[in-house]
Amino acid sequence: MCGIVGYIGQAGDTRNYYALDVVLEGLRRLEYRGYDSAGVAVYADGEISFRKKAGKVAALETEIARAPLPDSVLGIGHTRWATHGGPTDVNAHPHVVAGGRLAVVHNGIIENFSELRAELTAKGYNFVSSTDTEVAATLLAEIYKTEAEGDLTRAMQLTGQRLDGAFTLLAIHVDHPDRIVAARRNSPLVIGLGEGENFLGSDVSGFIDYTRSAVELSNDQVVTITADSYEITDFHGAPSEGKPFAVEWDAAAAEKGGFHSFMDKEIHDQPAAVRDTLLGRMDEDGKLMLDELRIDESILRSVDKIIVVACGTAAYAGQVARYAIEHWCRIPTEVELAHEFRYRDPIVNEKTLVVALSQSGETMDTLMAVRHAREQGAKVVAICNTVGSTLPREADACLYTYAGPEIAVASTKAFLAQITASYLLGLYLAQLRGNKFADEVRVILDSLREMPAKIQEVIDNEEQIKQLGRSMVDAKSVLFLGRHVGYPVALEGALKLKEIAYLHAEGFAAGELKHGPIALVEDGQPVFVIVPSPRGRDSLHAKVVSNIQEIRARGAVTIVIAEEGDTAVDEHANYIIRIPQAPTLMQPLLATVPLQIFACAVATEKGFDVDQPRNLAKSVTVE
């Protein structure tokens, strides 16, 4: 999500390119990350010149052709995915402040930007955009002037201490034409090392055409690069170190972060996708703040029914969310396939809240369902991953999932981000309606905040899961069983295997076994079972263990996904995939990940293109 590039070379060298060439090429390489505007800034002859434009890099290049920038050996560039403020020319980066003397680009979300903006406004600063980036740039300028005594590196260190959230910042200043200063926290930044030139990028794609020698920065570090050196410190000025590495991928592989496929990369992106979707949505006291939910509170309090409309994977995310929303809000909640919704004369009125889930925001079936719901007087909240798409424009409000672009057709990180955003919506409604006290909401939010690290634990165990997938490449059919929130996880696991491995797979509610599906179980039949926590509803856990015994007795190969410490499954499982302990409603964020890894491994072993499976499209824009 977003892309950053920085370049500094030596004046008077004999290279056949300038900073602008490097930065624009880097931005093109980073287009796969997704964005809605782009901009560049260069230093030459004592001045910073910049151009920025809503739209694609091509639109920026057209603007530069119309109004050329000077030749320069110092430049920074940015592709923006809108978070605070819409995708406009004004909100695009870079933000140039301090009378044109300082230019800043930024990736991430500054959680405390509202407080900082108020503080800076009180000091007489004016803002021309609605972005958190302009606030960070203005804060950097203020600290540079008042506390850092003209030391740009020190100013960046102090600024890093003041900012909450996730950010990568790059800055150039007319007082320091020989350097770029950058900082990072929970947002990627890599140094590229050349000969008489150095680079910065969100990832190595930004400079892979120029160097294969790189240094990865860690959290809460500041780096100052010149044409022939770099220096890393922490936010308090103490010397620090990065992690040098050699880039062995080509440019195409670099866009995938060195992974075999975009799907593999996006599975690994999931801790960040969940974390970024949570960012900026809680105040310092832990209270949930959904400023994007611009629907009158009295209307939300009067809601007496919620209908989730979606298709495919998004519909399964909605099914997970239903358990949480009904539990927290005590509002009857239905989940409808969007393409069925408007054809069955649904009961919808002004007290109905329709929640529409779509990664792309362009799913035609979902858009048609939304239009029908609004015609009946319902309010619509979109949960979407794509700023500027149709769905947010047609909804009454939108909660964006900050998962970043999802390139692979089969959804992975968008699914977890949709669950996360749906949970935030449910908690907000519970908080607003008084179903949950502030301390109860805070406990649940704390559990959500723990999920990125726990998802990473599951991913760290991927080799065991991949080996299992490779061993089952000749399976003719795979079944998936789950109860409660494990049921939609089973459905999603089956869908992934269908989508990318072209393998017959079915997901069932485990309680349905005796009502028909157990007839499918024969000797050697692989069956995944998602086991609920024994620390939750004991009866539910015991029933699933009983289901495992039933299918094992009929010759099934049982692959059990169970939390750490659950020994009740040990004697009944052929394979056990352990996930970290978590509250029942958080388990889908963990239990889904092994199923994604398994499907990807099976499809890869079969030699299929996991990113572009046959007959499928990423965005279904027809009914």
UniProtKB/Swiss-Prot annotation:
PROSITE patterns: GATASE_TYPE_2, SIS. NCBIfam families: glmS, PRK00331.1. Homodimer. The keyword Repeat applies. Transmembrane segments: none annotated. Residues 295-435, 468-613 form the SIS domain. Residues 2-228 form the Glutamine amidotransferase type-2 domain. It holds the Pfam family SIS. This is Glutamine--fructose-6-phosphate aminotransferase [isomerizing]. Its EC number is 2.6.1.16. Its main location: cytoplasm. It comes from Corynebacterium efficiens (strain DSM 44549 / YS-314 / AJ 12310 / JCM 11189 / NBRC 100395).
